[in-house]
UniProtKB/Swiss-Prot annotation:
Role: NDH-1 shuttles electrons from NADH, via FMN and iron-sulfur (Fe-S) centers, to quinones in the respiratory chain. The immediate electron acceptor for the enzyme in this species is believed to be ubiquinone. Couples the redox reaction to proton translocation (for every two electrons transferred, four hydrogen ions are translocated across the cytoplasmic membrane), and thus conserves the redox energy in a proton gradient. This subunit may bind ubiquinone.
GO biological processes: aerobic respiration
Gene Ontology molecular functions: NADH dehydrogenase activity; oxidoreductase activity, acting on NAD(P)H, quinone or similar compound as acceptor; quinone binding
Organism this protein belongs to: Rhodococcus jostii (strain RHA1)
Protein name: NADH-quinone oxidoreductase subunit H
Gene name linked to the record: nuoH
């Protein structure tokens, strides 16, 4: 035990009895299975309220059992394996996507050390000297399942969805890792429990505001959620990488997506919102950060981030692919590099005995955060219409005479196609159409005496 008996000593990990370790793992598994069910229901309800609808209201009291009914329906559906797929990889891909999402939660601290049946143990399955890097690596493995699902489906749309997901993860994990680096530099550790202990008095959301904004943006892109859901864009790729999946395989992809949402939300809580520390003014109460109360504060913070996911999906349209890539490579990564250099400089001055850390970081953070907001607004503001491009005349087109242009048959393929540069349409003869008597259907009688 360290720091007045509240924060767990790293030596405590690995010495729990087997039944206690099994109980912790089972509790985390139940938490990660139940939270997506509640998140899906809350998402449908909140989006319905934002769109002035009712939402699920049939299954159970006020529709509270709708997620359970959907899960049972998916489990009872027939699993259809399309013809021409790579069957072993096709079956394993959902498992590869779902398992790392569960593994990443092993190092997330739910609370301080407590007594369970006489054994003093931290409310955390385990901890590592590089725990945050472990989470980053585990969440990165999930994209292999998405890519393999797209490749093994034997279809164009799933393959394009898998390739998009790969580019998305590569682009945004760089910015995410740089936001982690700022936290490591200030906390002096990569251990999740150590980072929580470093935020006992001041949360990093205030000291490292640019890192927080960059991480929140990156975590939405990392989980393929709207407005960054390009790998499964319905209007472009039908269903994306899981177009050819049904039944439990499709359910595992959905479970992996929502478990990843919970994981990145828990990591944001751990790194920037003080972890399981009580928010102000509840922190003024002496017992707020001891016992089982911190589990409640941690869960409420995670649900706050989950609400942000739902809010973004209900309010923002999907970005174009070029906008999305430009946001990652032209805005987030350069600003992350500059911010990490600022944090490293402040840390170096602190090591030399200059204790102006809080003031310097807050001032620099506000400036960088303002720059981030302005750049995001300029790039993503509504009504931004790109300037029309002027048509470029092919080289030599103006000098070509009609005699030198290549003859072109627009009906060669059975349907009309436009000519390419350097080709000309043949002259068509117009068939004259006679309109004489077009409205006459028979002889007319004029001045008839009958």
């Amino acid at each position: 035990m360290t720091i007045e008996g509240v924060y767990p000593d790293p030596a405590l990990f690995g010495h729990d009895p087997w039944w206690l370790v099994l109980g912790k793992a089972l509790a985390i598994f139940v938490f990660l299975v139940l939270t997506p069910l509640l998140t899906i229901l809350a998402e449908r309800k909140v989006m319905a309220w934002m769109q002035m609808r009712v939402g699920p209201n049939r299954v159970g009291p006020r529709g509270m059992l709708q997620s359970l009914a959907d899960g049972i329906k998916l489990a009872l559906k027939e699993g259809i394996v399309p013809k021409g797929v790579d069957k072993p990889i096709y079956i394993l891909a959902p498992v590869i996507a779902a398992v790392p999402a569960f593994m990443a939660f092993a190092v997330i601290p739910f609370g301080p050390a407590v007594s369970i049946f006489g054994h003093y143990t931290p409310l955390q399955l385990t901890d590592l000297p590089v725990a945050v890097l472990y989470v980053l690596a585990a969440t990165s493995i999930g994209v292999y399942g998405i890519v393999l699902a797209g490749w093994a489906s034997g279809s164009t749309y799933p393959l394009l969805g898998g390739l998009r997901s790969t580019a998305q993860v590569i682009s945004y994990e760089i910015a995410m890792a740089l936001s982690f680096a700022a936290v490591f530099l200030d906390a002096g550790t990569m251990s999740t429990s150590g980072i929580v202990a470093a935020q006992e008095h001041t949360w990093y959301v205030f000291l490292l505001l640019p890192s927080f904004l960059i991480y929140v943006t990156s975590m939405v892109g990392e989980t393929n959620r709207a407005p960054f859901d390009l790998p499964e864009a319905e209007g472009e790729l039908v269903g994306g990488f899981h177009t050819e999946y049904s039944s439990l395989s499709f359910a595992m992809f959905m479970l992996a997506e929502y478990v990843n949402m919970v994981t990145v939300s828990a990591l944001a809580t751990t790194l920037f919102l003080g972890g399981w520390h009580a928010p102000f003014p509840l922190s003024l109460w002496d017992g707020a950060n001891s016992g089982w109360w911190p589990v409640l504060w941690f869960t409420l913070k995670v649900w706050g981030f989950l609400f942000v996911f739902v809010w973004l999906r209900a309010t923002l349209p999907r970005l174009r692919y070029d906008q999305f890539m430009g946001l990652g490579w032209k805005i987030l990564i350069p600003i992350s590099l500059v911010w990490v250099m600022i944090v490293a400089t402040v840390r170096a001055f602190r090591n030399e005995g200059y204790d102006a850390r809080s003031i310097a970081l807050v001032v620099a953070g506000l400036v960088v955060a303002l720059v981030v907001v302005v750049l995001l607004w300029k790039r993503l503001r509504p009504g931004r219409v790109p300037a029309p491009e002027k048509p470029v005349e092919p080289r030599g087109r103006a000098e070509l005479s009609p005699e030198t242009l290549e003859p072109f048959d627009p009906m060669a393929g059975g349907y009309p196609v436009p000519p390419m540069p350097g080709q000309t349409l043949p002259a068509f003869r117009r068939t004259p159409v006679s309109v004489t008597g077009a409205h006459s259907t028979g002889p007319t009688q004029e001045n008839s005496d009958d």
